Design a protein with these regions (language model features):
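Short, low-complexity N-terminal intrinsically disordered segments enriched in polar/charged residues
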Residues: 3-4, 18, 22-54
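N-terminal export leaders
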Residues: 6-10
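Sec-dependent signal peptide hydrophobic core
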Residues: 13-17
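Structured segments of extracytoplasmic/periplasmic soluble domains
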Residues: 39, 43-47, 51, 62-66, ...
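Surface-exposed, charged secondary-structure patches
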Residues: 63-126
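Low-complexity, intrinsically disordered terminal/linker segments enriched in charged
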Residues: 110-114, 118, 123-131, 137-138, ...
Length: 160
């Protein structure tokens, strides 16, 4: 009977992890804009839903490079001044807290690589409509802008 060495176990772990990353990237590239938005918003359903963190891995996966840079710049400026960032809430639900039971998500294709998603929901009695401009790149769909009743995400991030 052959013993599995630690090295073989580690190599097998890396192979599985690499395969998972590759299959996730392939799945993301195959997603429809509606699938992309459904995958985001399912994280916000229910009173104790955690939402999505806006950490580096999430921003890399979800946003276009220019919008990602604006989010990072806002966080850096705030940290430098020891202040709260201009983005002081969750841009996906336009709130700091939420209790959402369901979402009505519709998508309108603008071009083969551009779509606009409209998300309607009730956040504990506050009716909201969020519009997301989506752009497809080689690794899947990304958000290029989010618009709420308060304006665009880029405008909020700039502090204007």
């Amino acid at each position: 009977m052959r013993m599995i060495s630690r090295r073989n176990l580690i190599e097998a772990g890396f192979a599985v992890a690499a395969g998972s990353v590759i299959s996730l990237a392939a799945a993301a590239a195959e997603q429809t804009p509606k699938d992309f938005l459904d995958a985001i918003y399912k994280n916000y359903i229910g009173k104790n839903a955690k939402g999505l963190p806006l950490d580096k891995p999430a921003t890399m996966r979800l946003f276009t490079p220019p919008l990602r840079k604006a989010i990072d710049d806002d966080s850096r400026r705030a940290a430098k001044r020891n202040e709260v960032p201009n983005l002081d809430g969750d841009p996906f639900v336009d709130a700091q807290d939420w209790d959402i039971k369901s979402f009505d998500i519709s998508v309108q294709d603008k071009a083969p690589d551009k779509s606009t998603g409209t998300v309607k929901f009730d956040n504990d009695g506050d009716k909201k409509t969020i519009t997301l401009d989506l752009v497809k790149s080689s690794d899947g769909w990304h958000i290029d802008e989010i618009t709420t009743a308060d304006g665009t995400l880029r405008k909020i991030l700039s502090g204007k």
